[in-house]
Amino acid sequence: YKRQTVGQAVTILMRMLGYKDEDIGGIWPDSYMAEAATVGLTEGVSTNGSAGLTRAQAARLFLNLLRTQTKEGGTTFASTLGQTVQGVLLSADTEGGEGRLRLSTGTYTLTEGKASNGMLNGMKGTLIVDSKSGRALTFVPEDLGSSKTVVLASAKATEMTDTSGNTYTVKSDTQVFQNGEASSWGEAYTWLNA
């Protein structure tokens, strides 16, 4: 098993967007990383192309891929996968064994065997619908804010501290999810210290 690098992943995704070596130029992986940053593919991801790729980075890159314009422009990569529907995800449920997503623009059945945990309820975004079956493939939330992965050392009612000693202020009414259930930081922070 050889760990993939951020540069390798970015190169693959840039090629999926229609870019070729002759479009990029320069020295690999730096040239691909620079062009990927220009088109928004690496937003929220380390720009060190030689670093090992984490699962969180891979997930963020794929999410960014769905939002990124193809090389030809005028269309996002998501729209190459099927019909896209803009709206707010109001609820996700399962009825009769089939998962359904109810958007502000209509209700869609998920691809067979798929279900949603409801974590994206209330978010605005794009639903990708399979052109042949009419079933929902995935929901891509709009890019809201940023994220950072840290190793937690301790948590208090108004802050958390990582193992590097950095402290992050957290309002007690900040929404968090614990075991798939919505809660507030003030109610849920204690389980982090357990």
Mark where each language-model region is.
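Short, intrinsically disordered, charge-balanced linker/junction segments flanking boundaries
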Residues: 174-175, 181-194
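N-terminal propeptides
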Residues: 2-159, 165-167, 184-190
